[in-house]
Amino acid sequence: MDIIEDLKWRGSIKQTTDESGLANLLKHKKISLYVGVDPTAKSIHIGNLIPLTILKRFQNAGHRPVIVVGGGTGMIGDPSGKASERKLLPKDVFDENVSRITKQMTRLFGKDGFEIVNNYDWLSKLDLISFLRDYGKLFSINVMLKRDVVASRLQAGISFTEFTYQILQAIDFYTLFKEKAVQLQVGGADQYGNISSGVELIHKLVGPDTEAFGLTVPLLLKSDGTKFGKSAGGAIWLDPEFLSPYEFYQFFYNQTDADVVKLLKIFTFLNREEIEELADKVKNEPEKREAQRRLAEEVTKFVHGQTAVEEAGKISRILFNGDVENLTASQVAVAFSGVPTIEVADQKTDVVELLVKDKVIEKSRRQAREDLKNGAITINGEKISNVNGVIDPTEKFDGRFIIIRRGKKKYFLAKVQ
């Protein structure tokens, strides 16, 4: 199966500017291709990972990926998918974001076999007169107004700055084609108009038969119709500073049976036979969650590395078995970062007072005593039934945490101050 057919089987293609032309090109040569990354945040998120995964598939097949960090276009603001004008960030903020995202890309693609460039390097040198003479004359206002990204904003209003964004992105593609022989741009579903502008610019400046193509990925929806890529805590970031590898792992492990096979196709590098085998397990042995475990392992390995997979798996097994006393302090900090949390003093404390602190765990002393007597309270892995018991916060986890469980699954964390 060639790479285009594989991407179609995986459901990873929304549109192409010329599918047959692209397929024919790929049969005869290895190409360079690119994805643009917007540095308006310190980290990319799981939605950005879909086109990057396509780039990785091309890299694995011997093609050469190029990542364009939008240090220039990001300062202008992409109107795609936005209902209102973006707030422009200071250049020093962009510079920091560009640096962080560059490191994230290196983790995904390795140190060799790909290239990262910043479009600020060429866009910043483009003066207004050259912009208007060399490029502006090649773009029809009528066509630009019909692009979805512009048409959807005409009612609410769009600035000239954002209106010209598609020209700047087109200049990116032309520059990369001319200087680095890039022949394919990959982007999100909302980027099709911008990508088409780039292909058209190359055809006008180089020739109508020039082999330059665009490919977009679909908007990924869950089986319930909601947009994939959000959790209760917000975006699923790829930077471990904003979302721990364990939480990242858990996000994928917690996907439903209805969604997991689709996600295996889009986000993993497992082959068709392996995915179909996992699909059979979802159908015949869903309680084992083998497909979810494999999905979590594969995507976490791609983003954070094998060591992170092993650590996440270890924490998951310990929590599943209820053996929290075997966790290290650093593992506790990661595994319980999202549970209800209280702060306690660095001194021995009455167990009932601990349970009613800030009314987070128990609402009353009566309820706390009742749960203790009924064996419903576990502290640091040990069941506590003595209503007069005393807890020493220095005994476990380097004196930093106390883990409280009420019932079978409800966890709380006390941070020792």
Swiss-Prot record:
Keyword Hydrolase: no
Motif, 'KMSKS' region: chain positions: 227-231
Catalytic activity: tRNA(Tyr) + L-tyrosine + ATP = L-tyrosyl-tRNA(Tyr) + AMP + diphosphate + H(+)
Protein localization: Cytoplasm
Residues spanned by motif 'HIGH' region: 39-48
GO molecular-function terms, A-Z: ATP binding; RNA binding; tyrosine-tRNA ligase activity
Enzyme class: ligase
EC number assigned by the record: 6.1.1.1
Residues that coordinate or bind L-tyrosine: 34, 165, 169
Source superkingdom: Bacteria
InterPro entries referenced in this protein's UniProt entry, alphabetically: aa-tRNA-synth_I_CS (IPR001412), aa-tRNA-synth_Ic (IPR002305), Rossmann-like_a/b/a_fold (IPR014729), S4_RNA-bd_sf (IPR036986), SYY-like_C (IPR054608), Tyr-tRNA-ligase (IPR002307), Tyr-tRNA-ligase_bac-type (IPR024088), Tyr-tRNA-ligase_bac_1 (IPR024107)
Alphabetized CDD domains for the sequence: S4, TyrRS_core
One matching Pfam family: tRNA-synt_1b
GO CC terms: cytosol
Family: Belongs to the class-I aminoacyl-tRNA synthetase family. TyrS type 1 subfamily.
The protein's assembly and partners: Homodimer.
Function description: Catalyzes the attachment of tyrosine to tRNA(Tyr) in a two-step reaction: tyrosine is first activated by ATP to form Tyr-AMP and then transferred to the acceptor end of tRNA(Tyr).
Name the UniProt record assigns to this protein: Tyrosine--tRNA ligase
